[in-house]
């Protein structure tokens, strides 16, 4: 989805390293991570530190936009992958998600107009991966990570894809190194 080919008012991207010709706010790094919010509408209160990231990785950006005289808080995230499990990477993912949930709880007390989007790096349910059994001990699908995702939904957020596609598979990622696209061995993590 690119501004030159669609008429959307707001764009959110992950793995972003430079800005486009809209009002854009980018929080990126040289070689990986990075998030942005790109909008036709004026963005206010842009922040990249709404949760404290001990590793200072570029994983979150938030902004407010006015729509129909209402302030909407936009939050774009790039959740840590967390693999391999039983390493500091997995602990970082769990702590990052805990911090995000804590912040979302706080924000949702005063603002009911929040749009949370991005790369969650979570496979929410069995129908969201081609072979759930093979991912049981993967950081994308471990039960404790899926519980954290459901905890976010419990704050009043909706899984928009599942809302419109209750049982339909719809993958967002295929491993490019193993011919996964051709075999449709995908997963929904975004």
Model regions and ranges:
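Short, surface-exposed beta-edge/turn micro-motifs
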Residues: 34, 189-190
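Single conserved hydrophobic/aromatic residue that forms the stacking wall/gate
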Residues: 1-7, 11
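Surface-exposed cleft-lining segments at the edges of enzyme active sites
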Residues: 51, 79-97, 133-138
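Metal-dependent phosphoesterases centered on the DNase I-like endonuclease/exonuclease/phosphatase
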Residues: 16-23, 96-189
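Structured beta-strand-rich core segments of catalytic domains in phosphoester-bond hydrolases
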Residues: 9-84
């Amino acid at each position: 989805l690119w501004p030159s080919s669609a008429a959307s008012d707001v764009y959110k991207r992950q793995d972003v390293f430079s800005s486009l010709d809209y009002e854009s706010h980018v929080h990126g790094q040289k070689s990986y991570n990075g998030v942005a919010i790109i909008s036709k509408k004026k963005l206010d209160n842009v922040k990249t530190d709404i949760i404290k990231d001990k590793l200072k990785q570029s994983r979150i950006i938030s902004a407010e936009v006015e729509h129909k005289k209402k302030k909407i808080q936009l939050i774009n995230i790039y959740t840590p992958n967390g693999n391999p499990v039983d390493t500091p990477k997995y602990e970082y993912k769990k702590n990052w998600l805990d911090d995000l949930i804590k912040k979302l709880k706080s924000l949702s007390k005063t603002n009911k107009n929040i749009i949370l989007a991005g790369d969650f790096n979570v496979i929410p349910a069995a129908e969201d991966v081609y072979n759930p059994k093979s991912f049981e001990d993967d950081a994308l699908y471990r039960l404790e990570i899926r519980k954290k995702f459901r905890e976010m939904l419990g704050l009043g957020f909706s899984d928009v894809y599942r809302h419109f596609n209750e049982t339909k598979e719809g993958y967002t990622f295929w491993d490019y190194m193993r011919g996964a696209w051709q075999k449709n061995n995908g997963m929904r993590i975004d």
